[in-house]
Amino acid sequence: LPFTGREEDDQTKTIEFASSHYDLFVEVVGIPAVGKRAGSLPVLEICGVSPCTDFENRACGEATDYLLETTYESDKKLLTARANIMRHMNHRDVNVCLRQASGEELLAEINLADFLAANPMIDCSKQEVLIPIRIEFKAGAIKVTVPEWYVEQVKPEF
């Protein structure tokens, strides 16, 4: 429901409330030869995102990069991160980057606009949006997809 408030005595402004963020989930599978010591795992970053939105839900502020908090499941060789990022108008400016622990060597970079164009089942026009990204290292190649758990196979019964 819209909230109506007085801007001045003779004016009323209606503001529609809507979700101001996207949920981002990144999983990295088959990380190449990570060391056994702490701090040797690759790091995930989300680059070029808006740091805030104004009261009318418009992205604002200077584009910012965030280092994501990750969890590593050694038995599955699975690195995951979950974050909320502000809604932004231009997906082209946003990248998900996977770097060596030192932060110097870039292992993978995924442009959000390209990823969303290749995966139209992710609908960023909805109120609650989950953007799931799977980065898989396999046989010397890197494959970027939507995780299988996100794609729901529907078989209608007639």
Region spans (language model):
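Tryptophan-paired
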Residues: 36-120, 158
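Short, low-hydrophobicity acidic/polar segments
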Residues: 1-20
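Compact mixed alphabeta submodule
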Residues: 11, 32-33
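A short, Gly/Thr-enriched small/hydrophobic beta-strand-prone motif that recurs across taxa
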Residues: 18-32
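Hydrophobic beta-strand residues in large extracellular and virion-surface proteins
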Residues: 15, 26, 44, 96-98, ...
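Intrinsic-disorder/low-complexity, polar/charged segments enriched in Ser/Thr/Lys/Arg/Asp/Glu/Gln
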Residues: 10-12, 23-25, 78-80
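Hydrophobic, glycine-enriched assembly/anchoring segments
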Residues: 124-158
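Solvent-exposed, conformationally flexible loop/turn segments
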Residues: 6-10, 115-119, 126
